[in-house]
Amino acid sequence: MAMWIGALVTYTIVRAVPARSLTARTPSWRVLVQGLAPGLLVGVVQAVILAIIAHTVLDLPLLDFAPLLSLLLFAAATFAAVTFALTAWLGGAGRVLGVALVVAAVAGRAVSAVPAWFETIAPVLPLTPAMNGVAAFAAGAPGVGAAVGGLLGWLVLGLAASYAAVVRSRMAGSRGLARLSRSGA
């Protein structure tokens, strides 16, 4: 949850697709990488801190640190891509949706008497595979592989939606410039 909130706050402070990139000659994939960088940086820092805390609190064997950190880094990259896409496509509404997703994920974990419709959507929330993976890892139970698969699905979806948002934003910027040049402004 902390990494999701970190990514969400990052794209509240930093614009997902900077205005200067709308008309730059830089390829869209590079604009995407530059846009994802702040969220990834925050996520990496959070993942390292969380791995150290979890390793210490759970008294995990030293050999478990690298796999736990890898899972958290993968979750951080996934969260950065999904929150980038939400804010790039929907702006403020995407941020609100991001907050709603974290609230739903927390409610699904904390409240045992959730409505039936919620139990239907909870497994497909982007935070669910990360929380399931960390819980499985901490308990030494199976489920980490399924969690990685779920995160991979969300990562691919997040990157595709993010790239499409960058392309759309840049096309809108070109159209806006074309309108300005036609109007003589």
Task: Describe every region a protein language model picked out.
Residues 1-185:
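Membrane-spanning alpha-helical segments of multipass transporters and channels
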